[in-house]
Amino acid sequence: MNTSWNDILETEKEKPYYQEMMTYINEARSQGKKIFPKEEDVFTAFSLTPFNNVTVVILGQDPYHGEGQAHGLSFSVLPGVKIPPSLRNMYKELAEDIEGFIPPTHGYLESWAEQGVLLLNTVLTVEESQAHSHAKLGWETFTDSIIEQLNEKKEGIIFLLWGAHAQKKGINIDAMKHSILVAPHPSPLSARRGFFGCQHFSKTNELLREKNLSEINWSSITLD
């Protein structure tokens, strides 16, 4: 069966919880509140990584809440925006883990998404300068459904779950069907507790090789 994100998203969008959530968000925007990312970027992760192309999922929490940062991909920021601390630590780990990886001067991860890495936050919007302000609005239900669809309809996805939040979110993933790699979050608060040295990027490629799937060229972002 050829599943598309469109089918999955449209089913969710018809549900009352989703409609109530969007009413709240649209009212906030119309009142002049700054909601990130921009309306047209909320579903960027799905447009860049079609359902049938997903081989890896990197789960984030909620979008960056500073001006111009968030654009719909977890951990990623738009070109020209200062690289956030967690992403800087991801680059440090990549430089140790992947031969020849040179940390780029930007934090734009679009080329990973185009290779099949679903960069998914568990909450897809946030109000400016207010971290977690859109938690409990309904996005958690929405992204639970996304993960459930991936879990049920695909096999052999590699889920990278960093930190307690992501690990709790992935508790129902079938470890017989999929690969689950866990580590502390790359934030400065926890990176030294085991994110550094976790080698998740090379391990992901080892697992993809075993499945005869294309490896991720993590260094593609240095060419952007």
UniProtKB/Swiss-Prot annotation:
Entries under Gene3D superfamilies matching the protein: Uracil-DNA glycosylase-like domain
Q: Where in the cell is it found?
A: Cytoplasm
Keywords, A to Z? Cytoplasm, DNA damage, DNA repair, Hydrolase
Q: Which family does it belong to?
A: Belongs to the uracil-DNA glycosylase (UDG) superfamily. UNG family.
Main localization of the protein described in the UniProt heading: cytoplasm
Q: What is this protein called?
A: Uracil-DNA glycosylase
What superkingdom heads the lineage? Bacteria
Q: State what this protein does.
A: Excises uracil residues from the DNA which can arise as a result of misincorporation of dUMP residues by DNA polymerase or due to deamination of cytosine.
Organism equals Aliivibrio salmonicida (strain LFI1238)
Give the EC number(s) listed in the UniProt record.
3.2.2.27
Q: Which GO terms describe its molecular function?
A: uracil DNA N-glycosylase activity
Q: Which residues form the active site?
A: 62
